[in-house]
Amino acid sequence: ARICFKNNLPFQFLWMSQQAIEKYIKCILIFNRFPVKNIGHNLVAGIKKINDIPYIKLDLSDKSIYFIEYLNDQGPNRYFQKVMYTNGFEIITLDRTVWELRRYCRLLNYQLKTPKGELIDMLEVELRKIEHSRNVPPHKYKITDGYLEKRLKDNKYNHGNILTWKNLYFGKTKKNTIKIGRS
């Protein structure tokens, strides 16, 4: 999606953005042992299903919620069956939405066994990690052994550069501003 945006391919950008967000939504459901059947490409239905998980209070900004609804409408329009529109700043909102969803892409409700055989519930610890992530600069949030973190580190296939291009939420350093030209 990021490459499509960079190369001024708005139709493809929207479709790939929709696909990316769909994968994050389904990842959250799978990690939390909830079925992903009957969602298809419907992002709003996926978010509804996540909100049905009793211990998850999905903390998404209004901009991300709006963007998910926008992608739900525009993303599947890859065959140009209806009017497509963009405002030119979708890359920023995609990055924000990915960052907000990605924090939940982990096993949350599990137990660890101590050497003494005691079981420790980790749900509260994991939920606190998610809550705490809002209090640190976004670029400092890392998923241990995460795919994006690996690509940022090794820059294999130039992925690190693609991931960090005009990305306020992911990278090695904090970005306060970015410039986006509009055509």
Predicted regions and their residues:
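Charged alpha-helical initiation segments
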Residues: 1-14, 28, 32-35
